[in-house]
Amino acid sequence: KTFGQPPYKFLTNMRLDFAERLLVETDYTFSEVAFLSGFSSQSHLTSTLSRLRGMTPAKVRKSK
């Protein structure tokens, strides 16, 4: 808890940060972004991003 949160939450947030960066800075598909950022599937990325950040991958990408 060095970062004030359990390790799994810290890692999830790091993966989401990386996924958001890929969505904004690349033209990778949502499935590719999910795989590259450590999510098991596109739907896992979408549900986690929606639950924790309140945005879908498409909305993140449109915010370029």
Regions found by a protein language model. Give the residues of each.
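Terminal helix-turn-helix DNA-binding modules in bacterial transcription factors
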Residues: K1-S40, K62-K64
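Key DNA-contact positions within bacterial/archaeal DNA-binding proteins
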Residues: S43
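…primarily DNA-binding HTH/wHTH and HhH modules…
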Residues: S47-K64
